[in-house]
Amino acid sequence: MSLSEPIFRMEGISKRYGGAIALKDADIAIRRGAIHAVLGENGAGKSTLIKIMAGVVTPDEGRMLLDGREIAFASPAAANAVGIVCVFQELSLIPDLSVADNITISHPPQRFGMIDRRAQRRIAEEALTRAGASDIHPSILVKDLPLSRRQMVEIAKALARKPRLIILDEATSALTRSDVEKVFAVLKRLRAEGMALIYISHRMHEIAQLADDCTVFRNGRSIESYPAGTKTDQQVVELMIGREYNNVFPPKPAHRPEEKPILSCRELSWGDRLSGITFDIRPGEVVGLGGLDGQGQRDLLLAFFGVLRDLKGEIAIDGTQVKLRSPRHAKSGGISMALIPEDRKTEGLMLPMTVRENLSIAALDRISRNGVIDRAAERREIDDLFKLLAIKAATIDMPVAGLSGGNQQKVVIAKWLMNRPRIILLNDPTRGIDVGTKQEIYLLLRKLADGGAAIIFYSTDYDELIGCCDRVLVMYDGSIVRELEGADINEHELIGAALNIGGEHAQQRIAP
């Protein structure tokens, strides 16, 4: 088989869940030695497609061919056995096991009936090196790694299975920029070795850098396949959403709000993670936190939300100094703060519970009367939020796990809006969701700010900081090194400040 011929085909694939059509007559052909990008909004059918490829679910109609021969998978193990391995967006790692245990979990090396730890470590080290993550020690527990490093372990685990076709579902959404570059280098090397790769991402610039072939899905159908680089980003997005695509970011206000600050901090420090943080935010502002990942941005959000202990410095709400004792205190009526977490699966949602239960739990005090939930008030609140965020769900009593990723993220945001917060903290809120949902979230943030909310927005995506924020505070090594505003919020300035490149702006503090 030549490199230009498909190694794997799916023809006329359909899948239904009850009355809902997840896939309808979908086709795709994957070549050896090529990276094939699969694009589409959340709910377009991409997840069902790769679950069928990976043996997680079986199609109702259609056929799959590997090397020209028709095949069917009864389980993920059957797909793995022929060399098809998937790295899902929801990590499959077991937190309480070591990195080496996770990498070799399907086929641990044995000696005398016991796991051969020396061989296991060698396999893990080789896989981590191949994944560009040789700095991760095989014996460390997965739960002790940050999310970005866990994703690298997941990729190493897939490579340890020696795949012929590897499927990556939003594999870079949790990664730092340096890790993304390492993954790109790995994928390009695997392509050069003749491996077939399927790459799912909502980041258009990643598709432009990596892909050889592209297929767009919409409403469960494969809309068009084309060689990468033959369509503009706007044309691709219009294929994805089925309508004309306008500017993704809403307009910013012409003038900075003049009200008194709603939130202020002075010389806020925490161990060696935060140092001398000083700034104000006013009602109606969207203030971004920039900088390389891991420079204290998440710690700062947790400090404001009452999670961190032994803080030094001052925090004031409406000019009155406060000591935020807990998240419950931070979200209480006098302060009225909300935190949209980074990982919706583990921090933002209770997946087995219903949409209704997930939404109501953050506002029980407000929608209860004498300890009993007022169902009429609850329903009114939920209906209003469904309209505001355009949440798509068959019913509010369905498990939230059954929603698409974009709608799950909308539920996370809606949950915190149930409390009508005045201060909203967002930790990379659009990670792993489609461009259409991102645009809806950007519009919502500006609408909330226009309504008087103060928003602190951490994002690893420079385009979001540029498009959404009135000001950006760039952090480096736990400190704010530069404030950018207006035309200065551009990629050149953001990168320079993130690297703390010298000149008069280096180590610049924000004046009270």
Swiss-Prot record:
Name of protein: Ribose import ATP-binding protein RbsA 1
InterPro entries in the record: AAA+_ATPase (IPR003593), ABC_carbohydrate_import_ATPase (IPR050107), ABC_transporter-like_ATP-bd (IPR003439), ABC_transporter-like_CS (IPR017871), P-loop_NTPase (IPR027417)
Gene3D superfamilies found in the cross-reference section: P-loop containing nucleotide triphosphate hydrolases
Subunit structure: The complex is composed of an ATP-binding protein (RbsA), two transmembrane proteins (RbsC) and a solute-binding protein (RbsB).
Main location: membrane
PANTHER family: CARBOHYDRATE TRANSPORT ATP-BINDING PROTEIN MG119-RELATED (PTHR43790), GALACTOFURANOSE TRANSPORTER ATP-BINDING PROTEIN YTFR (PTHR43790:SF9)
GO molecular function: ABC-type D-ribose transporter activity; ATP binding; ATP hydrolysis activity
Name of a matching Pfam family: ABC_tran
Matches recorded under CDD domains: ABC_Carb_Monos_I, ABC_Carb_Monos_II
A GO cellular component entry from the record: plasma membrane
Sequence similarity: Belongs to the ABC transporter superfamily. Ribose importer (TC 3.A.1.2.1) family.
All residue ranges annotated as the ABC transporter domain in the record: 8-244, 257-502
EC number: 7.5.2.7
Lineage: Bacteria, Pseudomonadati, Pseudomonadota, Alphaproteobacteria, Hyphomicrobiales
Gene symbol of the encoding locus: rbsA1
Binding-site residues for ATP, renumbered to this chain: G40, E41, N42, G43, A44, G45, K46, S47
Function comment: Part of the ABC transporter complex RbsABC involved in ribose import. Responsible for energy coupling to the transport system.
Membrane association type: Peripheral membrane protein
This protein's UniProt keywords: ATP-binding, Cell inner membrane, Cell membrane, Membrane, Nucleotide-binding, Repeat, Sugar transport, Translocase, Transport
Domain of life of the native organism: Bacteria
